[in-house]
Amino acid sequence: DYPLWTASTALAGGTPVHYLCDETDGWQPDLADMESKITPQTKAIVVINPNNPTGAVYTRETLGRIVALARKHQLLLLADEIYDKILYDDATHVPLASVAPDLLCLTFNGLSKAYRVAGYRAGWLVITGPTEHATSFIEGIGLLANMRLCPNVPAQHAIQVALGGHQSIDDLVLPGGRLLEQRDLAWMKLNEIPGVSCVKPE
């Protein structure tokens, strides 16, 4: 559970319902548990992939099963993919929208993690799927976006350079990279503590 999703849902008047992710299965979502929690009041499924805080990267099969649930129950998909470039050990990120072309999917991303500029508060939303069925929703998103002030001008220039330039995150997650070494050390030290288990983040 990433607390911002819980808080945002509650702030909007909704009731967040958490589904299980199983440590013994590499923190993959428990699809039976997820389906058991879907009710007529359920509006969407939030998928944080790569996951925060577990570090799990969901398989295409797992994502396909989540999409099948969303399709069966006519649910919106909310894909938090802010960690999509921070991958270790040949892990592969599969964008949720690519598995659900027939469903409305909102994908959230930004600069804060992969480009290490959290203070810029620069991000984006991509809406895919049958948008013709969500025109009023999309208009509402547009109104909300227009009510917000834009990032500062240097940050806007940084977005263009970051997305179009050298992807330096690769140097940090490959062998010898600082993020990979920190991940490995933290994982090793946690597992050395008696009674503590830790799945290696992907």
Task: Locate each region found by the language model.
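Substrate-binding/gating loop at the entrance of the active-site cleft, primarily
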Residues: 1-14, 23
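Hydrophobic/aromatic ligand-binding patch that stacks against planar heteroaromatic rings
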Residues: 7-9, 69, 116
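Helix C-cap/helix->beta junction micro-motif
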Residues: 12, 72-73, 103
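Active-site phosphate-binding strand-loop segment of PLP-dependent enzymes
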Residues: 17, 22-92
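Hydrophobic residues at beta-strand termini and immediately following loops
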Residues: 17-19, 96, 108
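Conserved core segment of the aminotransferase class I/II
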Residues: 98-177, 187-189
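Conserved PLP-binding catalytic core of the aspartate aminotransferase-like
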Residues: 179-180, 195-202
